[in-house]
């Protein structure tokens, strides 16, 4: 992990197409701006974690549904 210090109105470049700018620094928060191509997904970590959990739930539900369909198919095949 790279750790950098930046002041307000300074920025960080990642590759040639991503720029992270420090807009404002307050007592307990930092306001940042991120410029990146539209195909780069940028999410707050708490939103990412929620999406990840919902995807896990969906996969488990799909597995349950597949199992139910298989059981029904087995029953109907008799």
Curated annotation (Swiss-Prot):
GO biological process, alphabetically ordered: bacterial-type flagellum organization; mRNA catabolic process; negative regulation of translational initiation; regulation of bacterial-type flagellum assembly; regulation of carbohydrate metabolic process
Molecular-function GO terms, alphabetical: mRNA 5'-UTR binding
Assigned GO CC terms: cytosol
Name under which the protein is recorded: Translational regulator CsrA
Location(s) in or outside the cell: Cytoplasm
Highest taxon listed in the record's lineage: Bacteria
Function (record text): A translational regulator that binds mRNA to regulate translation initiation and/or mRNA stability. Usually binds in the 5'-UTR at or near the Shine-Dalgarno sequence preventing ribosome-binding, thus repressing translation. Its main target seems to be the major flagellin gene, while its function is anatagonized by FliW.
Species name: Borrelia turicatae (strain 91E135)
Pfam families: CsrA (PF02599)
Family statement drawn from the similarity comment of this UniProt entry: Belongs to the CsrA/RsmA family.
Main location: cytoplasm
Keywords on record: Bacterial flagellum biogenesis, Cytoplasm, Repressor, RNA-binding, Translation regulation
HAMAP family named among the record's database cross-references: CsrA
PANTHER family linked: CARBON STORAGE REGULATOR (PTHR34984:SF1)
Subunit and interaction comment: Homodimer; the beta-strands of each monomer intercalate to form a hydrophobic core, while the alpha-helices form wings that extend away from the core.
Cystines in this chain: none
